[in-house]
Amino acid sequence: MLQSNEYFSGKVKSIGFSSSSTGRASVGVMVEGEYTFSTAEPEEMTVISGALNVLLPDATDWQVYEAGSVFNVPGHSEFHLQVAEPTSYLCRYL
């Protein structure tokens, strides 16, 4: 079953799903802006198109992840994103 989600006044939209190959996940798009997300469980983020400038928990430096890049976020934490162009992503809940 698909679940639509909308965050930050519609600037981030995702569709949640579950499959045997991916597990529980969501795929979405973010438009330009700065966002802070909280995690309940560990997440694996894959940038599909565009790029994300990311400040991970306990990090002091921002890091750019471009299309095809993957980064992991611990559970029960916050991470910050800067988005300069519309960017699509896949988020797997681990």
Curated annotation (Swiss-Prot):
Its EC number is 2.4.2.1, 2.4.2.2. One of its GO terms (cellular component) is cytosol. Keywords: Glycosyltransferase, Transferase. It catalyses: a purine D-ribonucleoside + phosphate = a purine nucleobase + alpha-D-ribose 1-phosphate; adenosine + phosphate = alpha-D-ribose 1-phosphate + adenine; cytidine + phosphate = cytosine + alpha-D-ribose 1-phosphate; guanosine + phosphate = alpha-D-ribose 1-phosphate + guanine. Gene3D superfamilies: Jelly Rolls. The keyword Transferase applies. SUPFAM superfamilies: RmlC-like cupins. Disruption phenotype: Cells lacking this gene show a consistent change in xanthine level. The keyword Amino-acid biosynthesis does not apply. GO terms for molecular function: guanosine phosphorylase activity; protein homodimerization activity; purine-nucleoside phosphorylase activity; pyrimidine-nucleoside phosphorylase activity; thymidine phosphorylase activity; uridine phosphorylase activity. Pfam families: Ppnp. InterPro entries: Ppnp (IPR009664), RmlC-like_jellyroll (IPR014710), RmlC_Cupin_sf (IPR011051). Catalyzes the phosphorolysis of diverse nucleosides, yielding D-ribose 1-phosphate and the respective free bases. Can use uridine, adenosine, guanosine, cytidine, thymidine, inosine and xanthosine as substrates. Also catalyzes the reverse reactions. Is not able to produce D-ribose 1-phosphate from D-ribose and phosphate. PANTHER family: PYRIMIDINE/PURINE NUCLEOSIDE PHOSPHORYLASE, PYRIMIDINE_PURINE NUCLEOSIDE PHOSPHORYLASE. Belongs to the nucleoside phosphorylase PpnP family. This is Pyrimidine/purine nucleoside phosphorylase.
